[in-house]
């Protein structure tokens, strides 16, 4: 299995966890709370009859005593039944979480094993030749706008954004990149596929030490899409956005 396949499998496991586990856990908790309420009501009824039973014990006939005692037994049996149902639901949820955790650990192990098989790319000195793509690093400051694309906008000579657009952009939540969806201090590399869902990836998340000399794609699927886009519009070959230091 290739590294791309392992990554795709891990993403699918993450998606399944985010899609199924919270919903099933929520339903289980709601059902347990419902059973708690029912058990509490039965306990209150049993307690009330118990008090009345002992208060009127001397005046009650043998038949009344038997009926009262049988009634309290039924109520306590119902409470026990609700408790068993709660335990069963909690046990099922525990099994679900254990299975999901085991599946994730299995995919993680496959990813690590395949990652160790990848040969380390040798460091190459940056080239000033226009025919060779170079990877540029950029350290972002707190005042940068549209972090990943700001360098390209300057190189393509785009006009500075109006203040109104900057205000709107500042009000929007920052876009999260990489499979981890975390904002952390790490060097990032961009997938050459313009339609890539994540765009930028942390070196530590993909096991990269040095940037490759040529184009880089996060998965084979992105590679196919990116090359297809270049083939359809060869006059608009994508320009390398390079690397950046994420803080």
Swiss-Prot record:
Residues 115-168 are annotated as: Disordered. It is found in: Nucleus. GO terms for biological process: cell fate specification; maintenance of left/right asymmetry; positive regulation of gene expression. GO terms for cellular component: NuA4 histone acetyltransferase complex; nucleus. Keywords: Metal-binding, Nucleus, Zinc, Zinc-finger. The keyword Zinc applies. GO terms for molecular function: zinc ion binding. Gene3D superfamilies: Zinc/RING finger domain, C3HC4 (zinc finger) (3.30.40.10). Expressed widely, including in the two ASE neurons. Zn(2+) 1 binds at residues 178, 180, 202, 205. Required to initiate and then maintain lateralized gene expression in the ASE sensory neurons. Involved in determining cell fate in the ASE neurons. This is ING family member lsy-13. It comes from Caenorhabditis elegans.
């Amino acid at each position: 299995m290739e590294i791309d396949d392992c990554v795709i499998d891990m993403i699918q496991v993450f998606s399944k966890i985010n899609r199924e586990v919270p919903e099933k856990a929520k339903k289980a908790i709601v059902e347990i709370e419902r059973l708690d309420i029912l058990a509490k009501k039965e306990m209150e009824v049993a307690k009330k009859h118990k008090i009345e039973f002992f208060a009127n014990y001397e005046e009650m006939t043998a038949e009344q005593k038997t009926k009262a005692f049988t009634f309290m037994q039924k109520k306590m049996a119902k409470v026990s039944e609700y408790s068993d149902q709660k335990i069963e639901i909690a046990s099922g949820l525990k099994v679900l979480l254990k299975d999901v955790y085991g599946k994730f650990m299995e995919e993680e192990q496959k990813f690590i094993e395949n990652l160790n098989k990848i040969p380390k790319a040798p460091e190459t000195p940056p080239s000033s030749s226009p025919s060779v793509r170079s990877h540029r690093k950029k350290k972002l400051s707190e005042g940068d706008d549209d972090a990943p694309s700001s360098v390209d906008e300057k190189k393509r000579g785009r006009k500075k954004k109006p203040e109104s657009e900057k205000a709107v952009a500042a009000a929007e939540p920052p876009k999260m990149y990489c499979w981890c969806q975390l904002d952390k201090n790490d060097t990032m590399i961009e997938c050459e596929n313009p339609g890539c869902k994540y765009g930028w990836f942390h070196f530590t998340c993909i096991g990269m030490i040095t940037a490759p000399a040529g184009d880089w794609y996060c998965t084979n699927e992105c590679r196919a899409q990116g090359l297809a886009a270049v083939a359809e519009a060869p006059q608009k070959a994508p320009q390398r956005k390079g690397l950046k230091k994420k803080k």
